[in-house]
């Protein structure tokens, strides 16, 4: 079973629908116990890092996600969900993240326009990686003003937008996409399908 975490930060319907279409069996939850029990946890999110951390803590989900990660059980973070994996964010201040992947979330400095919104090209570090097999192309959909800075060993793919930033990351069972696979058409669907086969 797959659970999509409801912490009042973003549109859960599009993520849930995309997962259903690919044969996942998603349910939406804000129950910390479910975070520990199910096969895959999906942490979506749109909005401010500070608000996301506050909501996760208030619902008891922050510690549940950290405990799940310590058990090496898979978590997928999408957009803000991915950013929450990192040590801290400098969005409107300085705020601690889940610290599941070492790194910091910072604002674009050289981007032609903020937010980075629309289609852009993924550049896989290794095009033979199972996450990127059978893709019709590498164009995916982004909406964000901040990005993660982390060690290259955790990066599966980069994207360029004024500056190079990690678009897909992995540390053990923790996988993050800065792009929205659920809004990325056939490419996003294939990536989610590949992820299912990896788990």
From Swiss-Prot:
GO terms for molecular function: glutaminase activity; imidazoleglycerol-phosphate synthase activity; lyase activity. Pfam families: GATase (PF00117). GO terms for biological process: L-histidine biosynthetic process. Keywords: Amino-acid biosynthesis, Cytoplasm, Glutamine amidotransferase, Histidine biosynthesis, Hydrolase, Lyase. SUPFAM superfamilies: Class I glutamine amidotransferase-like. Coiled coil: none annotated. Pathway: Amino-acid biosynthesis; L-histidine biosynthesis; L-histidine from 5-phospho-alpha-D-ribose 1-diphosphate: step 5/9. The active site is at 79 (nucleophile), 180, 182. It comes from the Bacteria. Its EC number is 4.3.2.10, 3.5.1.2. PROSITE patterns: GATASE_TYPE_1. It is found in: Cytoplasm. Heterodimer of HisH and HisF. This is Imidazole glycerol phosphate synthase subunit HisH. The gene is hisH.
